[in-house]
Structures are given as structure tokens and as C-alpha cells.
Amino acid sequence: MRPLKYLSILILPIVVYISFTSKGLLTHLPAIVFFFLLPLLELFIKPNKENLTKEEEKTEKENKIYTYILYGTLPVQIGFLGFFFYVIQEVGLTNTELVGRVFGMGIMCSIIGINVGHELGHRNNRINEFIGEILLLTSLNTHFLPYHNGGHHLNVATPKDAATARKNEIIFLFWIRSHFTSYIQAWKIENNRLKNSGRSSFHYQNRMITYTICNLLLIGGIYFFYGQFVMISFLSAAITGIILLETCLLYTSDAADDSDC
């Protein structure tokens, strides 16, 4: 039964598909479902407060279906990204319909691109990590892995953590500070990692060099094959995904008690 609940992630591409193939109010269906209907539904559903037993936890960890479901999000995300490049060019779309479709893709960038990419990036397996990297690339947030694993977990809830909100910090300032500071710190983490292993910061194993080049190649490739409008639409969707992530970080992190926060 639990794997079936895990498949509820498929609600997202179904709803976004309706947005991509509709006009009018339905183009905003992803926002309506995930920011209104589901939160409203949660008010009437009692949460399950029971934890798994140790035996159940061991059994679930050995069940590969969960990993396969995560793997399955990769072709879904890439497929919808390609579909997005096509439907965003549809003739006759109003500005509000364009916003609805961009926001729908942005939700996919956040939930599948960043969230699932983050989960796979935590695993000590190169295949899992690579799939996570590709998913994060679709959201232009590849620096998330080195920073999150090498910085956030080490410094969470302290002034050193870019992703920890400062006391009374304005949300718009948090978006900017958290994202760009974590990007800079990701470079520092990679440089220190290579330095400690006796390698130059410009070594080919510097993930931030690879990630930055891949981000630029993706943006440039979209511009070359689809044009400026599609590129801007993709950037808008990716930024939407990043903002949704940063907003979650803001409201789930505790402000550090340090006087500088």
C-alpha cells in the first residue's frame, strides 16, 4: 500500500499536462491544486502519527520500488521540459495563460527537479547521484548538491548556513541571499575538497566547474534551438522552482540564536 501512496507524485505531471493542453482558468490548475485544494484537503485528513517498526523499516529499505519510482521521475521531467518548450510557443496564448504554464513547469522544477534530485543526491551511489544531478540541472540548481551535503548539513541553524533564515528576515531578501550565497559557498566547498586531496581548484573533478558549464550549455542550447522567448520562459520556470524551494527553507528553518542573525 505504501508504494501506491508514493506514486501520488504522478498527480503533478497529470495536473501540469492539463495546464499545458488547456486554455483559460485550467492553465492555472497546478497552482489551484497544490496551493489551494491540497492544503484545504489536509485540514480534513487526520495525519498518521504511527512510525514504522524496526522490522518494517528494514523491509521498506530493501524494497527497490521506491528507488525505481524516483528513477522514473527523470524521463517524466525531461519529457515535460521538452513539451513545455513546444506548448509555450502556442499561438494565441494570453499573458495569464503563459504565466499559468510557466508556473506549472516551475512547480515541476521544484518538486521533481530539485526535491527528487536532492533525495537522490544524498545517496552514496554514483548512478543515483548522476540522476539527481540531471534533475537539478533541469532547474538550474546543480550547486545544491555540494552545498547542501557539504555545507547546509554541517552548519544548519547557524549564521554560517546560507539556507537558514535570519531572525525577521524579509522573504525577498532571503531568496536572494540564500541562493547566491549557497552558490558561492558551493565553490568554496569544492575548492577546499580538491585542495585537501592535493589538486588544483581548476581540476576537472571540480563539480562546480562542470555544473556551471552544463547550466550555461543548457541555456545556450535552448536559445539556439528554440529562440529567446522559450529561453526566457525556461529561466522563469527554473527561477520559480528555486523560489519555491527557498520559500520552504525559510518557513522550515529556525533562526539561529547568534546576535548576527
Where are these regions (language model features)?
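Core segments of transmembrane alpha-helices
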Residues: 9-12, 73-81, 210-219
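Short, hydrophobic transmembrane alpha-helix segments
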Residues: 15-28
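Juxtamembrane helix-capping/reentrant segments at transmembrane boundaries
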Residues: 54-73
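Membrane-interface helix-loop-helix junctions at boundaries between adjacent transmembrane segments
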Residues: 95-100, 108, 112-136
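Membrane-proximal soluble regions of multi-pass membrane proteins
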Residues: 127-194, 259
